[in-house]
């Protein structure tokens, strides 16, 4: 693994049957998302500024005779196929010695533009890194699970190109920025949003730091997502009235975010949101 990844440099194997590992699957947001073109293979060429919130799902792993996965939490019921879950797939793609009993506490909404499943897989990669070390081809293994997974393994601000798997570092002058996530509790699958994109290339990312790129950027999937879930518009309008300096939709939606100058501004904004909406307040990593 690259030295700049921020992951633990030395393996920390299970020490006895009672030891457990715990990782947060940090919520992913796209501070900017520029879709450049449709590719012949059906995917899209894009440029995005990944950022991560200091909160998300929680995963725990304990030694067990065989791998297993238990899911609970507010959004656990949305994952009705544990064997098809990306956490189970991440376990299956990585050598990790004895079996692991993994518990996933699902706090992030599903199909929400937050990379929830990819973040969960990224947390598994970090747990395996701590306990056994990752194979040299970990990035390729992560990319096979999903376009956002390599970035979620690192869980640090970066630029993503190609389908999002080609990562580049960027000076992160947004770490610690107060952020509020809001979702109208309407799932929105990625495929239909990309299909509704108008195909117009509106240009590349611009800027030398995370703040500059975010401020100058846009989300090209916002308009197609709005055409499918008009309630996103109400979320954006409400957030823009709360004094944040940047409000935008994340990923393919329907979650939107606002960035603030102070935690007090963020907390007041969160308290002003309709109780029927899902919210999460935190800070950028």
Curated annotation (Swiss-Prot):
Catalyzes the phosphorylation of the position 2 hydroxy group of 4-diphosphocytidyl-2C-methyl-D-erythritol. Transmembrane segments: none annotated. HAMAP family: IspE (MF_00061). This is 4-diphosphocytidyl-2-C-methyl-D-erythritol kinase. Pfam families: GHMP_kinases_C, GHMP_kinases_N. InterPro entries: GHMP_kinase_C_dom, GHMP_kinase_C_sf, GHMP_kinase_N_dom, IspE, Ribosomal_Su5_D2-typ_SF, Ribsml_uS5_D2-typ_fold_subgr. It catalyses: 4-CDP-2-C-methyl-D-erythritol + ATP = 4-CDP-2-C-methyl-D-erythritol 2-phosphate + ADP + H(+). ATP binds at residues 109-119. GO terms for molecular function: 4-(cytidine 5'-diphospho)-2-C-methyl-D-erythritol kinase activity; ATP binding. The keyword ATP-binding applies. NCBIfam families: PRK14608.1 (NF011202). It comes from the Bacteria. GO terms for biological process: isopentenyl diphosphate biosynthetic process, methylerythritol 4-phosphate pathway; terpenoid biosynthetic process. Belongs to the GHMP kinase family. IspE subfamily. It is an enzyme of class 2 (transferase). Keywords: ATP-binding, Isoprene biosynthesis, Kinase, Nucleotide-binding, Transferase. The active site is at 28, 148. SUPFAM superfamilies: GHMP Kinase, C-terminal domain, Ribosomal protein S5 domain 2-like. Pathway: Isoprenoid biosynthesis; isopentenyl diphosphate biosynthesis via DXP pathway; isopentenyl diphosphate from 1-deoxy-D-xylulose 5-phosphate: step 3/6. Its EC number is 2.7.1.148.
